[in-house]
C-alpha cells in the first residue's frame, strides 16, 4: 500500500474507489494499491 498526495491508476485494471472519505486505488496487482493522504 502506497500513501500518496495524489493517486492515479497505473494500469488498465486499476480502479479508483472511495472508502470512508478516502480515495483509494485497488488493482489485481498488489503493488498498485494506493491510498490518499
Swiss-Prot record:
Could you list this entry's UniProt keywords, alphabetically sorted: Ribonucleoprotein, Ribosomal protein
In the UniProt record, which is one GO cellular component term?
A: cytoplasm
Please, one GO biological process term?
A: translation
Query: Looking at the Swiss-Prot or TrEMBL record, what is one Pfam family this protein matches?
Result: Ribosomal_L36
What's one GO MF term for it?
Answer: structural constituent of ribosome
Q: Which InterPro entries match?
A: Ribosomal_bL36 (IPR000473), Ribosomal_bL36_sp (IPR035977)
In terms of NCBIfam families, this protein maps to: rpmJ_bact
Q: Which family does it belong to?
A: Belongs to the bacterial ribosomal protein bL36 family.
Q: What is this protein called?
A: Large ribosomal subunit protein bL36
Q: Tell me what organism the protein belongs to.
A: Clostridium kluyveri (strain ATCC 8527 / DSM 555 / NBRC 12016 / NCIMB 10680 / K1)
Amino acid at each position: 500500500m502506497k500513501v500518496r498526495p495524489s493517486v492515479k491508476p497505473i494500469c488498465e485494471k486499476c480502479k479508483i474507489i472511495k472508502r470512508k472519505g478516502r480515495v483509494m486505488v485497488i488493482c489485481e496487482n498488489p503493488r498498485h494499491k494506493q491510498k490518499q493522504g
